[in-house]
Amino acid sequence: MEEKKYLKWYNKIGYGSGDIAGNVVYAFLTSFMMPYLTDSVGLAAGVVGTLIAVSKLFDGFTDIFFGSMIDKTHSKMGKAKPWMLYGYIGCAITLVSCFAVPVSLGTTAKYAWFFISYTLLNGVFYTANNIAYSALTSLITKNSKERVQMGSYRFIFAFSTSLLIQAITVGFVDKCGGDAAAWRTVAIIYAIIGLVVNTISALSVKELPEEELNEGEVKDDNEKYGMVQAFKLLVKNKYYMMICGTYILQQLYGAMIGAGIYYMTWVLKNKNLFGQFAWAVNIPLIIALIFTPTLVGKWKGMYKLNLRGYVLAVIGRALVVVAGYMGSVPLMMAFTALAALGQGPWQGDMNAVIASCSEYTYLTQGKRIDGTMYSCTSLGVKIGGGIGTAVVGWLLEFSGYIGTNATQPQSALDMMQFMYLWLPLIFDVLIMFVLSRMNVEDANKKLKAEKGIAADEVTDASDIN
Protein backbone atom coordinates (compact mmCIF):
# COMPACT_ATOMS: atom_id res chain seq x y z
CA MET A 1 0.00 0.00 0.00
CA GLU A 2 1.47 3.34 -1.13
CA GLU A 3 2.01 5.94 1.57
CA LYS A 4 -0.03 9.14 1.47
CA LYS A 5 1.83 12.12 0.00
CA TYR A 6 1.78 15.43 1.85
CA LEU A 7 4.21 17.73 0.04
CA LYS A 8 4.40 19.50 -3.32
CA TRP A 9 7.72 20.08 -5.05
CA TYR A 10 7.82 23.70 -3.90
CA ASN A 11 7.32 22.65 -0.26
CA LYS A 12 10.39 20.41 -0.48
CA ILE A 13 12.50 23.11 -2.12
CA GLY A 14 11.21 25.75 0.30
CA TYR A 15 12.05 23.56 3.27
CA GLY A 16 15.47 22.66 1.89
CA SER A 17 16.37 26.31 1.33
CA GLY A 18 16.26 26.80 5.09
CA ASP A 19 19.75 25.31 5.30
CA ILE A 20 21.05 28.23 3.27
CA ALA A 21 20.29 30.30 6.35
CA GLY A 22 21.75 27.68 8.68
CA ASN A 23 25.02 27.47 6.77
CA VAL A 24 25.34 31.22 6.39
CA VAL A 25 25.90 30.99 10.13
CA TYR A 26 27.59 27.62 10.49
CA ALA A 27 29.94 27.49 7.49
CA PHE A 28 31.07 31.08 8.00
CA LEU A 29 31.60 30.57 11.72
CA THR A 30 33.46 27.24 11.60
CA SER A 31 35.64 28.06 8.58
CA PHE A 32 36.64 31.63 9.32
CA MET A 33 36.06 32.58 12.96
CA MET A 34 39.42 31.27 14.19
CA PRO A 35 41.47 32.94 11.38
CA TYR A 36 39.58 36.20 12.01
CA LEU A 37 40.27 36.14 15.75
CA THR A 38 43.92 35.06 15.51
CA ASP A 39 45.07 36.95 12.42
CA SER A 40 42.88 40.11 12.39
CA VAL A 41 42.02 40.67 16.06
CA GLY A 42 45.29 39.25 17.42
CA LEU A 43 43.86 36.84 19.99
CA ALA A 44 45.68 33.66 21.03
CA ALA A 45 44.39 30.49 19.36
CA GLY A 46 44.67 28.44 22.56
CA VAL A 47 42.66 30.89 24.66
CA VAL A 48 39.96 31.13 21.99
CA GLY A 49 39.81 27.33 21.88
CA THR A 50 39.38 27.15 25.65
CA LEU A 51 36.57 29.73 25.61
CA ILE A 52 34.77 27.74 22.93
CA ALA A 53 35.09 24.55 24.98
CA VAL A 54 33.70 26.30 28.08
CA SER A 55 30.81 27.64 26.01
CA LYS A 56 29.90 24.08 25.00
CA LEU A 57 29.09 23.24 28.64
CA PHE A 58 26.04 25.46 28.25
CA ASP A 59 24.90 23.90 24.99
CA GLY A 60 23.95 20.44 26.24
CA PHE A 61 21.32 21.97 28.51
CA THR A 62 19.83 24.31 25.91
CA ASP A 63 19.50 21.58 23.27
CA ILE A 64 17.27 19.43 25.48
CA PHE A 65 15.47 22.54 26.78
CA PHE A 66 14.48 23.89 23.36
CA GLY A 67 13.58 20.43 22.06
CA SER A 68 11.26 20.00 25.03
CA MET A 69 9.80 23.49 24.51
CA ILE A 70 9.03 22.72 20.87
CA ASP A 71 7.20 19.55 21.91
CA LYS A 72 5.08 21.62 24.32
CA THR A 73 4.35 24.49 21.90
CA HIS A 74 0.80 24.87 20.54
CA SER A 75 0.29 27.85 18.22
CA LYS A 76 -1.51 28.76 15.01
CA MET A 77 1.80 28.36 13.18
CA GLY A 78 2.44 24.96 14.75
CA LYS A 79 5.06 23.61 17.12
CA ALA A 80 8.36 24.32 15.38
CA LYS A 81 7.81 27.21 12.95
CA PRO A 82 7.66 30.00 15.58
CA TRP A 83 11.00 28.88 17.02
CA MET A 84 12.55 28.62 13.56
CA LEU A 85 11.38 32.11 12.58
CA TYR A 86 12.15 34.10 15.70
CA GLY A 87 15.28 32.20 16.65
CA TYR A 88 17.03 33.35 13.50
CA ILE A 89 16.65 37.03 14.35
CA GLY A 90 18.99 36.42 17.28
CA CYS A 91 21.26 34.34 15.02
CA ALA A 92 21.71 37.24 12.62
CA ILE A 93 22.51 39.75 15.37
CA THR A 94 24.98 37.54 17.24
CA LEU A 95 26.69 36.35 14.04
CA VAL A 96 27.58 39.96 13.27
CA SER A 97 28.66 40.46 16.87
CA CYS A 98 31.10 37.49 16.65
CA PHE A 99 32.84 39.19 13.72
CA ALA A 100 32.67 42.71 15.14
CA VAL A 101 35.05 42.54 18.11
CA PRO A 102 36.08 46.20 18.68
CA VAL A 103 39.81 46.49 18.04
CA SER A 104 39.97 49.38 20.53
CA LEU A 105 39.09 47.11 23.46
CA GLY A 106 41.69 45.65 25.79
CA THR A 107 42.66 42.02 25.34
CA THR A 108 40.50 40.71 28.20
CA ALA A 109 37.49 42.69 26.96
CA LYS A 110 37.96 41.26 23.46
CA TYR A 111 37.87 37.72 24.84
CA ALA A 112 34.75 38.56 26.87
CA TRP A 113 33.01 40.11 23.84
CA PHE A 114 33.70 37.03 21.75
CA PHE A 115 32.68 34.58 24.48
CA ILE A 116 29.33 36.26 25.16
CA SER A 117 28.51 36.63 21.46
CA TYR A 118 29.53 33.07 20.62
CA THR A 119 27.62 31.54 23.54
CA LEU A 120 24.42 33.44 22.74
CA LEU A 121 24.68 32.47 19.07
CA ASN A 122 25.33 28.77 19.61
CA GLY A 123 23.70 28.09 22.96
CA VAL A 124 20.48 30.04 22.47
CA PHE A 125 19.51 31.34 19.04
CA TYR A 126 21.08 28.77 16.71
CA THR A 127 19.80 26.02 18.99
CA ALA A 128 16.19 27.22 18.88
CA ASN A 129 16.30 27.75 15.12
CA ASN A 130 18.10 24.56 14.13
CA ILE A 131 16.18 22.12 16.31
CA ALA A 132 12.90 23.61 15.10
CA TYR A 133 14.02 23.43 11.47
CA SER A 134 15.07 19.80 11.81
CA ALA A 135 11.90 18.84 13.69
CA LEU A 136 9.78 20.00 10.75
CA THR A 137 10.83 16.78 9.00
CA SER A 138 8.42 14.84 11.21
CA LEU A 139 5.82 17.61 11.56
CA ILE A 140 4.96 18.44 7.94
CA THR A 141 4.79 14.88 6.55
CA LYS A 142 4.34 11.32 7.76
CA ASN A 143 5.63 9.86 4.48
CA SER A 144 9.04 8.21 4.92
CA LYS A 145 10.07 8.77 1.28
CA GLU A 146 9.21 12.45 1.51
CA ARG A 147 11.33 12.71 4.64
CA VAL A 148 14.33 11.30 2.75
CA GLN A 149 13.66 13.73 -0.10
CA MET A 150 13.48 16.62 2.37
CA GLY A 151 16.84 15.62 3.76
CA SER A 152 18.34 15.51 0.27
CA TYR A 153 16.96 18.93 -0.68
CA ARG A 154 18.10 20.33 2.64
CA PHE A 155 21.68 19.18 2.35
CA ILE A 156 21.95 20.10 -1.33
CA PHE A 157 21.26 23.67 -0.26
CA ALA A 158 23.51 23.26 2.78
CA PHE A 159 26.55 22.09 0.85
CA SER A 160 25.94 24.56 -1.98
CA THR A 161 25.95 27.37 0.57
CA SER A 162 28.98 25.98 2.35
CA LEU A 163 30.78 25.70 -0.99
CA LEU A 164 29.96 29.27 -1.92
CA ILE A 165 30.99 30.71 1.44
CA GLN A 166 34.26 28.78 1.54
CA ALA A 167 35.03 29.67 -2.08
CA ILE A 168 34.34 33.42 -2.02
CA THR A 169 34.83 34.64 1.56
CA VAL A 170 38.62 35.07 1.50
CA GLY A 171 38.46 37.13 -1.70
CA PHE A 172 35.36 38.98 -0.49
CA VAL A 173 37.09 40.06 2.71
CA ASP A 174 40.17 41.17 0.77
CA LYS A 175 38.01 43.31 -1.54
CA CYS A 176 36.38 44.90 1.51
CA GLY A 177 39.78 45.92 2.85
CA GLY A 178 41.16 42.74 4.40
CA ASP A 179 41.08 44.08 7.96
CA ALA A 180 38.83 43.47 10.98
CA ALA A 181 36.25 45.97 9.67
CA ALA A 182 36.05 43.99 6.41
CA TRP A 183 35.09 40.84 8.33
CA ARG A 184 32.30 42.79 10.05
CA THR A 185 30.96 44.02 6.70
CA VAL A 186 30.91 40.52 5.25
CA ALA A 187 29.17 39.19 8.39
CA ILE A 188 26.42 41.83 8.07
CA ILE A 189 25.79 40.88 4.44
CA TYR A 190 25.66 37.16 5.26
CA ALA A 191 23.34 37.75 8.23
CA ILE A 192 20.84 39.70 6.11
CA ILE A 193 20.83 36.99 3.44
CA GLY A 194 20.27 34.32 6.08
CA LEU A 195 17.42 36.22 7.72
CA VAL A 196 15.55 36.66 4.43
CA VAL A 197 15.99 33.03 3.32
CA ASN A 198 15.04 31.60 6.73
CA THR A 199 11.79 33.58 6.70
CA ILE A 200 10.91 32.39 3.20
CA SER A 201 11.68 28.78 4.15
CA ALA A 202 9.54 28.83 7.29
CA LEU A 203 6.59 30.31 5.41
CA SER A 204 6.84 27.80 2.54
CA VAL A 205 5.67 24.81 4.59
CA LYS A 206 2.73 24.07 6.85
CA GLU A 207 2.77 21.78 9.85
CA LEU A 208 0.15 19.04 9.92
CA PRO A 209 -2.62 19.47 12.50
CA GLU A 210 -1.85 17.62 15.72
CA GLU A 211 -5.01 15.56 15.18
CA GLU A 212 -3.60 14.25 11.90
CA LEU A 213 -0.13 13.67 13.33
CA ASN A 214 -1.68 11.64 16.14
CA GLU A 215 -4.25 9.89 13.94
CA GLY A 216 -4.82 6.35 15.11
CA GLU A 217 -3.20 6.93 18.48
CA VAL A 218 -4.90 6.82 21.84
CA LYS A 219 -4.54 10.03 23.81
CA ASP A 220 -2.87 9.32 27.10
CA ASP A 221 -2.41 11.80 29.93
CA ASN A 222 0.78 9.97 30.82
CA GLU A 223 2.20 11.20 27.52
CA LYS A 224 2.97 14.52 29.18
CA TYR A 225 6.54 14.71 30.37
CA GLY A 226 9.10 17.18 31.61
CA MET A 227 12.59 17.95 30.39
CA VAL A 228 14.21 15.48 32.80
CA GLN A 229 11.98 12.65 31.62
CA ALA A 230 12.61 13.63 27.99
CA PHE A 231 16.34 13.38 28.65
CA LYS A 232 15.89 9.92 30.18
CA LEU A 233 13.91 8.80 27.12
CA LEU A 234 16.67 10.00 24.82
CA VAL A 235 19.41 8.25 26.77
CA LYS A 236 17.44 4.99 26.69
CA ASN A 237 17.42 5.13 22.88
CA LYS A 238 20.77 3.70 21.78
CA TYR A 239 20.22 4.91 18.22
CA TYR A 240 19.82 8.49 19.43
CA MET A 241 23.17 8.18 21.18
CA MET A 242 24.72 6.79 18.00
CA ILE A 243 23.39 9.67 15.92
CA CYS A 244 24.69 12.19 18.45
CA GLY A 245 28.05 10.46 18.20
CA THR A 246 28.13 10.58 14.40
CA TYR A 247 27.03 14.22 14.39
CA ILE A 248 29.85 15.14 16.77
CA LEU A 249 32.39 13.17 14.73
CA GLN A 250 31.17 14.77 11.51
CA GLN A 251 31.58 18.24 12.97
CA LEU A 252 35.04 17.38 14.25
CA TYR A 253 35.82 16.22 10.72
CA GLY A 254 34.43 19.47 9.32
CA ALA A 255 36.49 21.54 11.74
CA MET A 256 39.68 19.87 10.53
CA ILE A 257 38.69 20.43 6.90
CA GLY A 258 37.99 24.05 7.83
CA ALA A 259 41.46 24.27 9.36
CA GLY A 260 42.63 23.67 5.81
CA ILE A 261 42.81 27.46 5.47
CA TYR A 262 45.96 27.25 7.62
CA TYR A 263 47.30 24.25 5.66
CA MET A 264 46.75 26.00 2.31
CA THR A 265 48.24 29.28 3.53
CA TRP A 266 51.36 28.01 5.28
CA VAL A 267 52.11 24.51 3.92
CA LEU A 268 50.93 24.79 0.31
CA LYS A 269 51.72 28.55 0.22
CA ASN A 270 48.45 29.45 -1.54
CA LYS A 271 45.43 30.38 0.58
CA ASN A 272 43.22 30.54 -2.53
CA LEU A 273 43.47 26.73 -2.78
CA PHE A 274 41.02 26.59 0.13
CA GLY A 275 38.23 27.68 -2.20
CA GLN A 276 39.27 25.13 -4.83
CA PHE A 277 39.24 22.31 -2.28
CA ALA A 278 35.77 23.49 -1.23
CA TRP A 279 34.60 22.63 -4.74
CA ALA A 280 36.20 19.19 -4.44
CA VAL A 281 34.31 18.58 -1.19
CA ASN A 282 30.89 20.02 -1.93
CA ILE A 283 30.17 19.21 -5.59
CA PRO A 284 30.46 15.40 -5.04
CA LEU A 285 28.32 15.74 -1.90
CA ILE A 286 25.61 17.48 -3.90
CA ILE A 287 25.77 14.83 -6.65
CA ALA A 288 25.45 12.07 -4.05
CA LEU A 289 22.48 13.82 -2.43
CA ILE A 290 20.63 13.98 -5.74
CA PHE A 291 20.78 10.20 -6.09
CA THR A 292 20.25 9.32 -2.42
CA PRO A 293 16.43 8.91 -2.54
CA THR A 294 16.75 6.57 -5.55
CA LEU A 295 19.49 4.51 -3.91
CA VAL A 296 17.51 4.22 -0.67
CA GLY A 297 14.65 2.72 -2.67
CA LYS A 298 16.94 0.44 -4.67
CA TRP A 299 18.65 -0.97 -1.57
CA LYS A 300 15.37 -1.05 0.38
CA GLY A 301 16.56 1.11 3.23
CA MET A 302 19.22 3.48 4.45
CA TYR A 303 21.51 1.19 6.44
CA LYS A 304 23.42 -0.48 3.58
CA LEU A 305 23.70 2.75 1.61
CA ASN A 306 25.13 4.72 4.54
CA LEU A 307 27.63 2.03 5.52
CA ARG A 308 28.87 1.40 1.98
CA GLY A 309 29.15 5.14 1.44
CA TYR A 310 31.45 5.55 4.41
CA VAL A 311 33.61 2.62 3.36
CA LEU A 312 34.22 4.64 0.18
CA ALA A 313 34.85 7.77 2.27
CA VAL A 314 37.53 6.03 4.35
CA ILE A 315 39.28 4.80 1.21
CA GLY A 316 39.16 8.31 -0.25
CA ARG A 317 40.62 10.00 2.84
CA ALA A 318 43.38 7.38 3.11
CA LEU A 319 44.38 8.21 -0.46
CA VAL A 320 44.32 11.94 0.39
CA VAL A 321 46.98 11.23 3.03
CA VAL A 322 49.12 9.41 0.46
CA ALA A 323 48.71 12.22 -2.09
CA GLY A 324 49.51 14.82 0.57
CA TYR A 325 52.86 13.25 1.36
CA MET A 326 53.52 12.93 -2.39
CA GLY A 327 52.95 16.68 -2.67
CA SER A 328 50.36 16.27 -5.44
CA VAL A 329 47.58 18.85 -5.11
CA PRO A 330 45.57 17.47 -8.10
CA LEU A 331 45.54 13.97 -6.58
CA MET A 332 44.58 15.40 -3.19
CA MET A 333 41.60 17.12 -4.79
CA ALA A 334 40.57 14.00 -6.71
CA PHE A 335 40.63 11.77 -3.62
CA THR A 336 38.94 14.48 -1.54
CA ALA A 337 36.10 14.35 -4.06
CA LEU A 338 35.97 10.54 -3.82
CA ALA A 339 35.65 10.71 -0.04
CA ALA A 340 32.93 13.36 -0.25
CA LEU A 341 30.96 11.22 -2.69
CA GLY A 342 30.85 8.46 -0.10
CA GLN A 343 29.79 10.82 2.69
CA GLY A 344 26.85 12.21 0.73
CA PRO A 345 24.14 9.56 1.29
CA TRP A 346 24.35 9.78 5.10
CA GLN A 347 23.95 13.54 4.87
CA GLY A 348 20.87 13.11 2.70
CA ASP A 349 18.96 10.54 4.74
CA MET A 350 20.12 11.52 8.23
CA ASN A 351 16.88 13.33 9.08
CA ALA A 352 14.86 10.31 8.01
CA VAL A 353 17.00 8.11 10.26
CA ILE A 354 16.30 10.47 13.17
CA ALA A 355 12.58 10.17 12.45
CA SER A 356 13.03 6.38 12.63
CA CYS A 357 14.83 6.83 15.96
CA SER A 358 11.84 8.81 17.23
CA GLU A 359 9.58 5.96 16.14
CA TYR A 360 11.87 3.54 18.01
CA THR A 361 11.35 5.51 21.23
CA TYR A 362 7.59 5.42 20.69
CA LEU A 363 7.62 1.68 20.02
CA THR A 364 9.72 0.93 23.10
CA GLN A 365 8.58 3.63 25.55
CA GLY A 366 5.15 4.74 24.28
CA LYS A 367 6.15 8.42 24.21
CA ARG A 368 6.24 10.92 21.35
CA ILE A 369 9.30 13.19 21.61
CA ASP A 370 9.81 14.32 18.01
CA GLY A 371 11.06 17.82 18.86
CA THR A 372 13.34 16.61 21.62
CA MET A 373 14.64 13.79 19.41
CA TYR A 374 15.86 16.34 16.87
CA SER A 375 17.97 17.97 19.57
CA CYS A 376 20.71 15.62 18.38
CA THR A 377 21.06 17.73 15.24
CA SER A 378 21.81 20.91 17.16
CA LEU A 379 23.63 19.14 19.99
CA GLY A 380 25.94 17.30 17.62
CA VAL A 381 26.57 20.30 15.38
CA LYS A 382 27.39 22.65 18.23
CA ILE A 383 29.35 20.31 20.46
CA GLY A 384 31.24 18.72 17.57
CA GLY A 385 31.82 21.99 15.75
CA GLY A 386 32.69 23.85 18.94
CA ILE A 387 35.06 21.20 20.24
CA GLY A 388 36.55 20.85 16.77
CA THR A 389 37.27 24.57 16.56
CA ALA A 390 38.62 24.49 20.11
CA VAL A 391 40.92 21.58 19.27
CA VAL A 392 42.20 23.48 16.24
CA GLY A 393 43.05 26.39 18.51
CA TRP A 394 44.73 24.20 21.12
CA LEU A 395 46.79 22.28 18.57
CA LEU A 396 47.92 25.46 16.84
CA GLU A 397 48.87 27.02 20.17
CA PHE A 398 50.71 23.87 21.23
CA SER A 399 52.65 23.83 17.97
CA GLY A 400 53.88 27.40 18.39
CA TYR A 401 51.66 29.08 15.79
CA ILE A 402 51.38 32.89 16.04
CA GLY A 403 48.91 34.37 13.56
CA THR A 404 50.57 37.78 13.28
CA ASN A 405 54.01 36.34 12.39
CA ALA A 406 55.30 36.43 8.80
CA THR A 407 56.66 32.87 9.10
CA GLN A 408 55.77 29.83 11.21
CA PRO A 409 58.03 27.23 12.90
CA GLN A 410 58.30 23.73 11.44
CA SER A 411 56.37 22.37 14.43
CA ALA A 412 53.36 24.46 13.41
CA LEU A 413 53.60 23.31 9.79
CA ASP A 414 53.76 19.67 10.90
CA MET A 415 50.69 20.18 13.09
CA MET A 416 48.74 21.71 10.20
CA GLN A 417 49.59 18.67 8.10
CA PHE A 418 48.44 16.31 10.86
CA MET A 419 45.16 18.19 11.32
CA TYR A 420 44.31 18.32 7.63
CA LEU A 421 45.51 14.90 6.48
CA TRP A 422 45.33 12.43 9.37
CA LEU A 423 42.52 13.58 11.66
CA PRO A 424 39.78 13.56 8.96
CA LEU A 425 40.74 9.95 8.13
CA ILE A 426 40.54 8.94 11.79
CA PHE A 427 37.11 10.56 12.20
CA ASP A 428 35.78 8.85 9.05
CA VAL A 429 36.88 5.45 10.36
CA LEU A 430 35.03 6.08 13.64
CA ILE A 431 31.87 7.19 11.82
CA MET A 432 31.96 4.06 9.65
CA PHE A 433 32.18 1.94 12.80
CA VAL A 434 29.12 3.63 14.36
CA LEU A 435 27.09 3.39 11.14
CA SER A 436 27.80 -0.35 10.99
CA ARG A 437 25.63 -0.67 14.12
CA MET A 438 22.90 1.83 13.30
CA ASN A 439 20.25 -0.41 11.74
CA VAL A 440 17.24 1.27 13.35
CA GLU A 441 14.95 0.44 10.41
CA ASP A 442 15.23 -3.31 11.00
CA ALA A 443 14.87 -2.77 14.74
CA ASN A 444 11.56 -0.97 14.18
CA LYS A 445 10.32 -3.69 11.82
CA LYS A 446 11.09 -6.38 14.41
CA LEU A 447 9.33 -4.42 17.16
CA LYS A 448 6.25 -3.94 15.00
CA ALA A 449 6.23 -7.62 14.09
CA GLU A 450 6.42 -8.56 17.78
CA LYS A 451 3.49 -6.26 18.56
CA GLY A 452 1.45 -7.35 15.55
CA ILE A 453 1.65 -3.96 13.84
CA ALA A 454 1.88 -3.81 10.05
CA ALA A 455 5.17 -2.35 8.81
CA ASP A 456 3.44 0.54 7.01
CA GLU A 457 0.77 1.08 9.66
CA VAL A 458 0.61 4.22 11.80
CA THR A 459 1.67 3.19 15.27
CA ASP A 460 -1.22 3.14 17.73
CA ALA A 461 -0.55 3.90 21.37
CA SER A 462 -2.62 0.91 22.39
CA ASP A 463 -0.21 -1.36 20.50
CA ILE A 464 2.76 -0.22 22.54
CA ASN A 465 1.60 -1.62 25.86
Predicted regions and their residues:
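Membrane-embedded alpha-helical bundles of multi-pass transporters/translocases
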Residues: 2-465
